[in-house]
Amino acid sequence: VLFSGSVRENILLGVHDLSSSEEADQRVRAALTIAACDFVDDLPEGVNTIIGEEGLSLSGGQRQRLSLARALAVRPSVLLLDDPFSALDVHTEEKIIEALRTGHEGLGGATTLLTAHRPSTVALADRVLLLEDGRITAQDTHTELMKLPQYRRLMSVQDEG
């Protein structure tokens, strides 16, 4: 969810540990980098562009990436994401997952739990939990879980759908 205001204001919403505007600018840049928000540089006023109901309308993928940037800007130790890449292409998704792993300027590197419906997203995870009837029935890497018939079946159904 984004709010009417500048890109910068949206990203810094909930951030309370900044001591200077220079530190805020650095935090915004790092969050935008990890969340693959390079489109922000092309906005009329960059991070100062007003978005939302009172401003520029963004695509679903752009909104999704800015929301992720905001979540990263608070420097969480645990990051919970619900299908965060559903509106993104696979290349952008891979870029973001790698950036989440490696971090940038003190951001990223958090333990990240995410739900995913695309097999391509699941395959990028370090560890996958298989749920059946609300219970964890297996956990391992995607490659190892592919040895289980119920997991293979689930992945093939998702590929088709």
Q: What name fits each language-model region?
A:
Residues F3, V28, C37-L66, P84, ...:
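ABC-fold ATPase nucleotide-binding domain signature/coupling loops
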Residues A73-S77:
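A short, proline-enriched helix->beta-strand linker immediately N-terminal to the Walker B motif
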